[in-house]
Structures are given as C-alpha cells and as structure tokens.
A protein has these predicted regions:
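Catalytic cores of the polymerase beta-like nucleotidyltransferase superfamily
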Residues: 5, 9-525
C-alpha cells in the first residue's frame, strides 16, 4: 500500500526558491516544509510526519474536518505527484468517503463557503478557503459508453482503491492522508523514479474509455519529461477511432498545454510517432459536425534526411530541437513546430548539384501553417503572426548573413504594405523572428555562440522598425500640420507618411512642417 520504493530526487527536481517571487506569500512556508524534507531524503523515505507537514494549510483543514466527522479523506492525484517530484502543487484535490451532502454539512458547520460542483452526478464539492478553491470529490467509479470523453455512468465507491483504479496514469493515482501516510497501489513512485509514464491497468482500456487521455499522455510526457512506457505506446492505437468523437476545443487545450511545456519535444514526438497526429477530432458548426485533422502534416518529417553540411539531424529531430530552443510562448512554439513543415513536399524537395534542397519551403510552409491554425480556430491575429514568422524565417537568415544587403528596404516595404498595426508591433515581430531563427541555428546542432550575429541583426531590425512609422499617427508632426493640410488632411497625411516610409523625408517636426506647406502650395490651398 504505502510507497516502499526509494525515490532519488535529482537536484534539478528540487524546487528553486528564486522562482517563488510570483507565488503568494502563504506558499513560502509550504515551500520550506517541502524543501526541509527533500534536503534530508527522498519523498518515499521521508517519515509520515515530514510528508504530512508538506500538505497545504487549507487542504489540511479539510482533511482534519473529515477526520473529525468520521470520514476518510486524502489528498490525491497531481498534488501528490508534484510533492513526490519536489514541486509545490498548483491545485490540491481531495478524495473522501463522505457523500456530497455530508461534505456540504461539514462545510456549513465551520462557516466555509461551499459550491456544489456537480455533487449529484460527479460527487464534487468545491470548498473555498483563504481565497483558494479545493475540489473535494466522493470516492467514485466510472463506466464509459459511446461518448469519447465523458463517462456514461458515475457511481459512488466504497474504498479509496476503487477510486484510484479509475485514474489515468500511475503517477496520478497516488493518495496521502493528513498524517503523511502514502497510498501507492499502482507503482506511481517507482514510475517517478524511473521517469516513466504508465497507465493504471491496461493501456488500451484506459484510452478507449476516454480518448482525451491519449493527448494527456503526450502532455504529461512533455510536462514531466517522462518516457512513455512501451505498454502505453502499444495501447494507444486501439483507441484512435475514438478520437473522432473528441471536440476540437478539448484537443486544442491539451495541445496548447503540451506546446508550452519545458520538454514539449518529448510530448510532440509521442504524438507524431504513435500516429495520433494523423487522427481527427471534430467541431460542431451550424448544427453539423466537421472533421478536424490533428496534425498529419508533421508525419512526413520523421526520418526525412537533410543536407549534412547544414543539418546535424533529420527534419523531425531538427523541428523538435528548435521547438525546445525557443521560449515557451504559444506564438513561438507554434512557429517553431511549423517553420519547416513544407520540407520534403512535392515541388519543394529536390536534388540540385548533388545536394538536398527545399527551396520555397518557407512560403509553402506559411500556407500550410495558415491552414492548420485556421482549422484549429485560432484567432486571425495569432494565425497571421505565426504565418509571418514561418514565411520570413529564411529571409531573416539571408539578411543576417549578408551585411551588404539593404535590410532597411525590408522594413520600409513592410511599413508601406501595412503588414503591422504599428511600428512597435513590427519591432516585436522582428524580435520574435530573431528568437525563432536563433533556435533554428541551435536546432541544426550548432552552439549558442553561432547565434550572436542573428541576435545583433534582430535587435537592429527592431530598432529600425520602431523608427519607421506604419500609420500617420506615428508621424512626429507639429500641431499645426492638420490645419495646414485642410481640407485634404487624410490625403496630405498619407503623402507625408509615404515619403517618410520611402526615405525621402525625415520623421521630424521641422521636415514634416515644411513638407506640409509644400503639399498645400502644390494643391493650391
């Protein structure tokens, strides 16, 4: 029952106190309690008292109240997993033998705010303590039917073991009582030690019950940096037909969480190599369901060779390396994932003078990125920003490596074409493009020092952008210029803007004032 296995916590698993600056002050004490246990020994070999001291104050109060009422209560799932990995949990979930109505009565006696979170159907009551929400759920078992994600029947269970049996992965199927006694029925601690992701029971059954668990497996691999157990991978395919019943909204949510994870490459590799990326989910629009492919466009990159002179890895490993080299922002992670998506495509892949080439993959990739993000129902602004990064990453490399080229013309053209809403937006996009292209270099197997030129060039382009007006509102004209241009203010302003963007006129008060007077004279005003 209790975890008897030894858990070796690596130094990079111990929570860094310097990262606590944005945490609420009340978590600092909890951090010290967790750290004091981990500095002595592993979570598994800590005494019950030491483990019990790591429980959040609010969760501890709820467990104590349940105990006083003669009910069983345990913290469960992700919070126990996080404690075992030396992390401060984000959420504290509690499972109990108490029925929802009993939990509501316990809360009322103590003056706690309690919210019925679907108690009758799912057995959940939300307790609010100190501004934090704690989900308290009655032991339950589930039966699944035709729905790809939701159980068709939820019934209350009698024991903790029954409740733990319904959970997805062993690392999420551990519980701990207020005294610190650990309940690890399925070897979750052992899997944490081995950095292994494994299902509770038969993988095929777990995934077929709830097809969203397929995506959760990929996401947990990315978040925890765990290797998927062979039994898990083998069990995935049997549940693929169930993916068609999942909503795009839920799949997109899991994908976004995966992509911003520290080890996103591990999760994406599982998604693609398992074949899950070739499945489709669905969205309901205008009363009818539409099929939405996950990411089949990525599959052809696996094993796709690249010119050894420039690339250390094949196209897929290169993509994964770039993915992890950029900062974990959705915009940059999507751009990294799709920046080379068109490599190897018909009409793109060729052999020229004995070399593998993919000329035009940036333009074609931008088209594919737009299609992908549009079907994912991402906002137009987000989509176009990713598309711009994919389309221009090779152009950035060219200018960064060609000091003699006139990069300022690029900025002027972007301003004239109104690609961006403001000069600051253009500058931000160049900084994003710089980060993507630096990651692209690192993803070729080159050292960070090889990106110094790109760093300098990207900063230069951002500064040029900030000085380049995109709209007439960004012209530095004196207050009397609109009056001078009247009644042709709009035409006159556009003329001044165009001349500044072309480099024929300085964006300065005196120059713009003189230009306005000349415009007025030419138009006989």
């Amino acid at each position: 029952m209790s975890g008897a296995c030894s858990l070796s916590l690596l130094s990079d698993r111990v929570y860094n106190k310097n990262k606590m600056t944005e945490k609420k002050v009340k978590h600092v004490g909890l951090l010290h309690r967790i750290s004091s246990c981990f500095t002595k020994s592993s979570f598994a070999s800590c005494s019950c008292d030491e483990r019990g001291q790591a429980i959040d104050e609010g969760a501890g109060q709820i467990l104590a109240a349940l105990e006083e009422a003669g009910k069983e209560g345990y913290i469960v799932g992700g919070c126990v997993r996080d404690l075992a990995m030396g992390k401060v949990p984000h959420d504290w979930d509690i499972t109990t033998s108490a029925r929802p109505e009993e939990m509501l009565s316990i809360a009322a006696l103590r003056g706690w705010k309690a919210i019925d979170g679907g108690g009758r159907r799912f057995g959940t009551v939300i307790i609010v303590l100190g501004g934090e929400n704690y989900e308290v759920t009655t032991f339950r078992s589930e039966r699944y039917g035709s729905d790809a994600h939701r159980p068709s029947e939820v019934s209350f269970a009698k024991t903790l073991k029954e409740d733990l049996m319904r959970r997805d992965f062993t690392v999420n199927a551990m519980a701990m009582d207020r005294s610190g006694r650990l309940y690890d029925e399925f070897g979750g601690l052992s899997d944490i030690e081995r950095k292994r992701l494994r299902t509770v029971g038969d993988a095929g059954e777990r995934f077929s019950e709830d097809a969203l668990r397929l995506f959760r497996a990929c996401r947990f691999a990315a978040q925890l940096d765990f290797m998927a157990d062979s039994s898990l991978v083998e069990g995935m395919e049997s549940a693929f037909p169930r993916v068609s019943g999942l909503s795009l909204e839920r799949v997109r949510q899991e994908m976004d969480r995966l992509l911003v994870s520290k080890h996103a490459a591990r999760g994406m590799d599982l998604l693609v190599r398992s074949g899950l990326a070739r499945c489709s989910c669905r969205i309901k629009e205008k009363g009818a369901y539409m099929e939405v492919p996950i990411l089949p466009e990525l599959s052809h990159l696996v094993g796709l060779p690249q010119q050894k002179e420039f690339h250390k890895y094949d196209a897929w490993y290169h993509t994964l390396a770039v993915l992890e080299a950029v900062s974990p922002e959705p915009l940059l992670r999507w751009a990294a994932l799709l920046h080379d998506v068109a490599k190897g495509m018909p009409g793109i892949r060729a052999i020229r003078k004995g070399r593998l080439t993919d000329y035009g993959h940036d333009k074609k990739g931008a088209e594919m990125a737009r299609d992908i993000l549009t079907r994912y129902r991402r906002s137009p602004a987000f989509t176009e920003e990713v598309v711009w990064l994919v389309e221009n990453h090779m152009r950035f490399h060219f200018f960064a490596n060609s000091p003699e080229a006139d990069a300022e013309k690029w900025v002027r053209q972007l301003a004239r074409d109104h690609v961006f809403a403001s000069s600051e937006a253009m500058a931000e996009s160049f900084l994003h493009l710089k980060d993507l292209c630096k990651a692209d270099i690192i993803g070729c197997g080159r050292p960070l020092s090889a990106t110094e030129g790109h760093e300098a060039f990207g900063n230069y382009m951002a500064e040029l952008s900030r000085r380049m007006p995109v709209t007439s509102k960004e012209l530095h004209y004196p207050k009397d210029v609109p009056a001078i241009l009247a009644p042709h203010v709009a035409e006159g302003m556009n003329n001044l803007l165009f001349r500044v963007q072309n480099g024929d006129l300085d964006n300065a008060e005196e120059a713009l004032h003189e230009a306005a007077l000349r415009f007025k004279k030419r138009h006989g005003m």
